[in-house]
Each structure stands twice: as structure tokens, then as C-alpha cells.
Swiss-Prot record:
Residues 66-95, 150-181 are extracellular. It is a multi-pass membrane protein. This is Casparian strip membrane protein 1. The chain crosses the membrane at residues 45-65, 96-116, 129-149, 182-202. Coiled coil: none annotated. PANTHER family: CASP-LIKE PROTEIN, CASP-LIKE PROTEIN 1U1. GO terms for biological process: cell wall organization. It comes from Raphanus raphanistrum (Wild radish). Homodimer and heterodimers. The keyword Electron transport does not apply. Keywords: Acetylation, Cell membrane, Cell wall biogenesis/degradation, Membrane, Transmembrane, Transmembrane helix.
Length: 207
């Protein structure tokens, strides 16, 4: 009586399984690479916008500080003992404004290299986090300077009847106009800093 023999070939299925697993891994790597490239391009666009905003903010803050620094007016009439003159250095708040906004402008210049790094390496977290924290601190300083100066400009235009403070802008019109321009410029820079912080927060968000 002849013996029956059974042959089981398991080599081919193993090969197919390995090939399938390699294909799955390659597909995952490909998808990850495409997602990273898309995220990097998106964040690079944000970084370029961030850099342009900083350049614009530098011009605005330098202009605001310079305009306030030149705020001065002397009335065409005077007495033997008194000359009617108004300048930014007559108000401690305006002096603080000039110094604070000058510091803000200097910070913006120093922040440009970090902004460039985020363009070159859009997925880098450290430079973006540094900018986010620093911008938040400087935003506080800018807001304080602009708000303090705005209160003095308001008093110069309207006075205060409760304390018998008379408005001076009817006499020192050019001085008040110059100071008001500086405050408006500083307020615009505050809005720019808010945008910069929002950009950094979006760039740090994980996809």
C-alpha cells in the first residue's frame, strides 16, 4: 500500500506578507512627508508675514517716538518775565512715551534675526516661542505708553472741569496735533503686536 505525501509551501505567502507590510510603511512615510511639507509651507508663509509686519512696526514705532520727541511749540507773544512754550519734556508721561517706544523699536530690530530663522526653519519651535513670549511683554509696554500718552492728550484737548484744568490745545494747536499723531502711531503698533502674537500662536499650533 503506497504512502500518501503532502507538501505545504509556506514561502510565497510570507513573501507576500512582507511585501505588503513594506508597502504600508512606505505609504505612511509618504503621507507623513507630504503632511510635513504642507505644514512647513503654511508656517513659512506665516513667518514671511511676521517678518513684514515687524518691518512695518519698526517704521511706525520709530516715527511715533521721533514725532513725540519733536513736539514743541512757542507762542508768538510773551511778557518780560514769561514765555509761553509747550514741549514734550514738560510732561513726564510724554517723556516716558518717547523712551518706551524707542525701546520697543529697538526690540523689533533685534527680533528680526529670530523672524528670519522662522522663515528658514518654519517647523522650529524655539525661535517662535521666544518671539511669542517677547512680543507679549513688549505689547504690555507699548500699550502702557500709548494709553498714558493718550490720557494726557485728551486732557490737553478737553481739560477737566472738576479740577479746573483748562484745555491748552486752543493755544498750542500744533503741539497737540503732533502729540496726537504720535499717540495714533503707537496705537497702530499695538495692533501690529496683537497680530504678531496671533501669528506666533497659530504657527505653534500642532496639526
Amino acid at each position: 500500500m503506497a504512502k500518501e505525501s503532502t507538501t505545504i509551501d509556506v514561502g510565497e505567502p510570507n513573501t507576500m506578507t512582507k511585501s505588503t507590510s513594506h508597502v504600508v510603511v512606505d505609504e505612511k512615510k509618504k503621507k507623513g512627508f507630504v503632511a510635513a511639507a504642507a505644514g512647513g509651507g503654511y508656517k513659512r508663509g506665516l513667518a514671511v508675514f511676521d517678518f513684514l509686519l515687524r518691518l512695518a512696526a519698526i517704521g511706525i514705532t520709530i516715527g511715533a517716538s521721533s514725532v513725540m520727541f519733536t513736539a514743541e511749540e512757542t507762542l508768538p507773544f510773551f511778557t518780560q518775565f514769561l514765555q509761553f512754550q509747550a514741549g514734550y519734556d514738560d510732561f513726564p508721561t510724554f517723556q516716558f512715551f518717547v523712551i518706551a517706544i524707542a525701546i520697543v523699536a529697538s526690540y523689533l530690530v533685534l527680533s528680526l534675526p529670530f523672524s528670519i530663522v522662522t522663515i528658514v526653519r518654519p517647523l522650529a519651535v524655539a525661535p517662535r516661542l521666544i518671539l511669542l513670549i517677547s512680543d507679549t511683554v513688549v505689547l504690555t509696554l507699548t500699550t502702557a505708553a500709548a494709553a498714558a500718552a493718550a490720557s494726557i492728550v485728551y486732557l490737553a484737548h478737553n481739560g477737566n472741569t472738576n479740577t479746573n484744568w483748562l484745555p491748552i490745545c486752543q493755544q498750542f494747536g500744533d503741539f497737540c496735533q503732533t502729540a496726537s499723531t504720535a499717540v495714533v502711531a503707537a496705537s497702530i503698533s499695538v495692533a501690529f503686536f496683537v497680530l504678531l502674537i496671533v501669528i506666533s500662536a497659530i504657527a505653534l499650533k500642532r496639526h
